[in-house]
Each structure stands twice: as structure tokens, then as C-alpha cells.
Amino acid sequence: KLEPSGWASRKLTTEEATNGIVGHLCSPDQKQSFCITVVKGRFADILAASDLVIGLAGTGNEQAVGLGKPVVTFPGRGPQFSEKFVKIQKRLLGDSISLMTREPSVIAGEILKILTDASIKEKMGAIGLERMGEPGGARKIALQIKEYFDRSKRAI
């Protein structure tokens, strides 16, 4: 499927393969040539370095939004990331994510719009941070549960 559009894969170095890089997809455009690096097992590192996330995973999208990253998403083909699930996630995350149809040209247009308009990117990031809250929520909940049980033991 890469051939008709002109995209090409670039050969990996041994060091890249050792560091979790699976491959590179490079554009045919000579004026604005760029490559997409495909990585496995380095989610946190890639997320931290990303300007935008194309996300098709519930928890992954929520983690990206929680770090202030804009997310472009669309229903997947499998049973887990269905249209129903994506709509529920959109209600949770609001305008920190762009919910698109499975139309490549529409998705690409949305990605370019976000990446080329700093105000949209910043707004989506701010909404994500607000929706997901500050880091440390799970720790705070665990401490509250521990305090509850500690009080219960003293009352006995």
C-alpha cells in the first residue's frame, strides 16, 4: 500500500533496532521530506517527545491528554476501540481530542490544522490537562483509602 502514494521504508541501523525502532516511513515530497519513525515498547518516551498523538487506545489517549498532547482519534476496526467507545471517550476528554471518521484525507487535514495552528494545539493541550487533572491522583486515592482503614482499625 505504500507504493502508490510514493512513501518508502528506510532501512534500520542495528542501533535503532536495539532501541525499539521498528521502521521508518519516508515521504516522497522532495521539498518537505520527512519520516515517521515507528517504535515499539517506548510509549512514555515517544509520548513525552510528541507534538500530537494519533491515538486508537483508550488508556493511551487518556495518558496523552493528561500530558497536554492533542489527540486525533477515530474508531478502530476491532471490538475494543469501537465507534461507541470513541464517542464515550470524547465525552470524557472533550475538545482535547479530535474525533474523526476513518477517512485518511480528513484525518490528515485535521492533523495538519492542529500542527500548523499553535492556538488550536495549545487549547487542546490545556483542555486535556484540565480534564485529566494533576499528576498523582492515584497516589492520593490510595492514601485516602489507607487513612480510612487506619481510622477503622483504631475505632475497633
Where are these regions (language model features)?
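Nucleotide-activated sugar donor-binding and catalytic core shared by glycosyltransferases
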Residues: K1-I156
